C-alpha cells in the first residue's frame, strides 16, 4: 500500500520541477533570443516580469503543500523524496542546458554574430551550466549520504 502523504509530496515535487524547468527555460530562451536577434530590452524585461511572479507564486504554494505532506512522513522517507527530487531537477536542468546549446548553435548558423562573441557566450553558458549542475550533484550526494546513514 502506498503512503498517501508520500504520494502527494512526490507529485507536488514533480510539479515544482516542471515550474522550475519552465522558468529556467523561459529565461534562457528570452536571453538567447535577445542575444541573436537584438530585441528591445524593455520587451525582454516585460516577458520575464510577466511570467516569473506567476511561476514563483505557484512554486511557493506547492512548496507549502510539500512541507505539510512531509510533516507526516518519517525522516528516511523525507530524505528519499529529496533524493528523487534533486535527481529529477538535475536531469531536467542538464536537458535544458543541452537544448539551449543546440538552440545557440542553430541561431548562430541562421543569424550569425561575431565568432569570438559566440564562443565567449558558449563558454560562459557552459561554465554556468557546469557549476549549477555540480552544485545539484553535490546536493544529491550529501542527501544520499544522509539517507544511507539513516538506513543503518
Curated annotation (Swiss-Prot):
Topology of the protein relative to the lipid bilayer: Multi-pass membrane protein
Pfam families for the chain: DUF5418
InterPro entries from the UniProt entry: DUF5418
CC per GO annotation: plasma membrane
UniProt KW keywords: Cell membrane, Membrane, Transmembrane, Transmembrane helix
Subcellular location: Cell membrane
Entry annotated with the keyword Membrane: yes
Top-rank lineage group of the source organism: Archaea
Keyword presence, Electron transport: no
Segments passing through the bilayer: 15-35, 43-63, 117-137
Recorded family membership: To M.jannaschii MJ0129 and MJ0587.
Stated name of the protein: Uncharacterized protein MJ0554
Amino acid at each position: 500500500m502506498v503512503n498517501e502523504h508520500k504520494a502527494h509530496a512526490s507529485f507536488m515535487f514533480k510539479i515544482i520541477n516542471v515550474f522550475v524547468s519552465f522558468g529556467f527555460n523561459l529565461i534562457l530562451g528570452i536571453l538567447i533570443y535577445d542575444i541573436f536577434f537584438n530585441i528591445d530590452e524593455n520587451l525582454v524585461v516585460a516577458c520575464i516580469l510577466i511570467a516569473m511572479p506567476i511561476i514563483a507564486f505557484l512554486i511557493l504554494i506547492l512548496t507549502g503543500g510539500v512541507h505539510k505532506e512531509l510533516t507526516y512522513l518519517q525522516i528516511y522517507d523525507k530524505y528519499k523524496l529529496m533524493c528523487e527530487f534533486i535527481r529529477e531537477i538535475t536531469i531536467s536542468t542538464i536537458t535544458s542546458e543541452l537544448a539551449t546549446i543546440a538552440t545557440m548553435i542553430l541561431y548562430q548558423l541562421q543569424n550569425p554574430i561575431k565568432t569570438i562573441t559566440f564562443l565567449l557566450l558558449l563558454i560562459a553558458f557552459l561554465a554556468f551550466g557546469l557549476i549549477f549542475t555540480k552544485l545539484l550533484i553535490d546536493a544529491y550526494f550529501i542527501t544520499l549520504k544522509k539517507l544511507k546513514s539513516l538506513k543503518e
